[in-house]
Amino acid sequence: AMRLLVIGSGGREHAMAWRLAKTPGLQKVFVAPGNAGTAREHELENIGITDPEALADFAEQNKVQLTVVGPEAPLAAGVVNVFRARGLKIFGPTKEAAQLESSKDFAKRFMARHNIPTAEFATFSESTAAHAYIDQKGAPIVIKADGLAAGKGVVVAMSLEEAHAAIDDMLSGNKLGDAGARVVIEDFLDGEEASFIVMVDGKNVLALASSQDHKRIFDGDQGPNTGGMGAYSPAPCVTPEVHAKAMREIILPTVRGMAADGIPFTGFLYAGLMIGKDGSLKTLEFNCRMGDPETQPILMRLKSDFVDLLEHGVDGTLDQIEAEWDRRIALGVVLAAANYPETPKKGDVIQGLPAGNSFGEDAHVFHAGTAEQDGRVVTNGGRVLCVTALGENVKLAQKAAYEAAVKISWDGMQYRKDIGFRAINR
């Protein structure tokens, strides 16, 4: 009887645990710390532990065969290093390898060193020099906090005023704390974005299904950036040609480069791609974990045994398997709390949740910022739920997801009404 552990509490981790729960011969999936959604599903059990050493103790005591890490913070804190030192099987990058995400400066220097296509950049920790560089470059221009900032450390400044204000916020105003003590300023890139997520075992790569995220809070990609308001898979802009090019120009050089630099990468590697009108590719960013909300539609389409993929990843044998996908489209819509992406309102009672989080075989509600209070599910974060559905095409998947989403409500609930619009407008 197999026991597994998923580290994290978001929609991505709920989707991982839900998919792992379908494993033949499974006894239990522990989720640390989990949320109200993972608390309510049959084979899942929440455990209130977040400290890496304590998690490793738990895994030893409960004979957990395999652990998978969802979010970036535990990776940057070295949870993989701790588990590996004790001989525990865990899929994810070490603290050192996770710098591809935890430091924008590390990632940009790495890409420059290994000739991986990305936007031209400069790094600053002192605001006078940063302001001067912006005046020299002009707008539009992109300013990124160096450290982890929950997807909110990026400002795409369309004017010089906006660019200077972002520098003041991050470097002088210390709005993002330590994460913003250094900034990376880079050229603005135009084109269509896609999320290209692969599994890496140190040397071999297994590509997962492509997807496209929707970062802005409002319809038509308006308003401030968020952690992501919805996603669908596959992304039609990732044609077979783009796929081959991404593997050849970005993914494989990254995996080889990390190994050559003495920091072999194991885990999920997520390259944010910018696909130019001419078919050129640039790397916008690296994440060293699956995306949220992209994981929800991706895992809804996965037909292969997820545990099998993870075990090959841990054992260094990803070259021996292929992943099989549902040919339908999966589309997920994030339902967010009032006032997100600013400080979200918490504690609102959520109405209309289906039993077992499921609206039938082809529509599922993945929980993120939820908690249980007096037997009821309440909002407990910015992105609260992700309603994900399968359909024969993007339009039908979109229709199914929104038909499910409207059954759920709470005070101030907000969501985008146009997830998937780029694929539909193609």
Give the location of each predicted region.
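Solvent-exposed alpha-helices and their adjacent loops that cap or buttress functional pockets
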Residues: 21-22, 38-40, 91, 113-115, ...
